[in-house]
A protein has these predicted regions:
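Helix N-cap motif at beta-to-alpha junctions
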Residues: 157-166
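Short, solvent-exposed beta-strand edge segments and adjacent coil->beta transition regions
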Residues: 153-155
Length: 229
């Protein structure tokens, strides 16, 4: 057994309408798989590339716009875990996602990759910005901000060159994922941006949020700091 898993004793406690409730997760089977890596230089990581010219972040949303918030980190912060939790509604979408990634990698158009997981799209973008030490501007367009930023639906975020955007869209359409593939952010690549990088969130052209990466990283590290004291 190469790794351990806490599902054998995982328990959660919460408060609902003044009553303390708890739930213990059922036993679950965990299968770990490994594969040889031919060349580590081809590895995709969350580190944003800042020397690739004009680039953007693209979300492939396997939740297909449902943006369910049940059980999310946002809900935990506000002590409310009600609502429908994210789920994989179509197993074929997962297979299609792997096909899309394989095709895009083979053409060399993927620069960075990260999953949308705990914390949702906002956390994904922040982690990628931390790794690349560069600014990111999220543009939510007409999406509901809270759901778009904090939903933990299955999905991935990839960095691609703007010149490759049309080709990536073609590949997504071929994989059957074109209608859930959206450009969500611009990556700051110039030197001025790297000196004082910021994370900015736009909606309908207005700034909803903006903060320096340094302040966000201090907040990010605070919990770990207190745990380690």
């Amino acid at each position: 057994i190469p790794v351990g898993k806490d599902s054998m004793s995982m328990r959660t406690v919460w408060e609902q309408e003044g009553e303390a409730l708890s739930n213990t997760a059922p036993l679950s089977l965990v299968i770990s798989a490994f594969a040889p890596l031919q060349d580590i230089r081809d590895t995709l990581t969350p580190e944003l590339k800042t020397t690739a010219g004009d680039t953007q972040l693209v979300l492939v949303d396997l939740g297909r716009g449902k943006n369910r918030l049940g059980g999310s980190a946002l809900g935990q912060v506000f002590r409310t875990l009600e609502g429908t939790a994210p789920d994989l509604d179509s197993a074929s979408d997962m297979l299609a996602l792997f096909s899309l990634l394989k095709a895009a990698r083979s053409e060399g158009i993927l620069l960075a990759y990260h999953d949308r997981a705990d914390g949702g799209l906002l956390t994904t973008a922040v982690e990628m910005a931390f790794a690349g030490r560069c600014g990111v501007t999220l543009d939510l367009a007409g999406a509901a901000p809270i759901e778009a930023l904090f939903s933990e639906e299955l999905g991935i975020v990839v960095q691609i060159g703007r010149a490759d955007s049309e080709r990536f869209t073609e590949l997504a359409n071929e994989a059957g994922l074109g209608d859930c593939t959206h450009t969500v952010a611009a990556v700051e690549a110039n030197d001025a941006g790297r000196k004082n990088p910021r994370l900015t969130v736009l909606s309908h052209g207005e700034t909803l949020y903006s903060a320096s990466l340094s302040s966000l990283q201090r907040t990010w590290a605070e919990t770990s700091y207190h745990m380690q004291k």
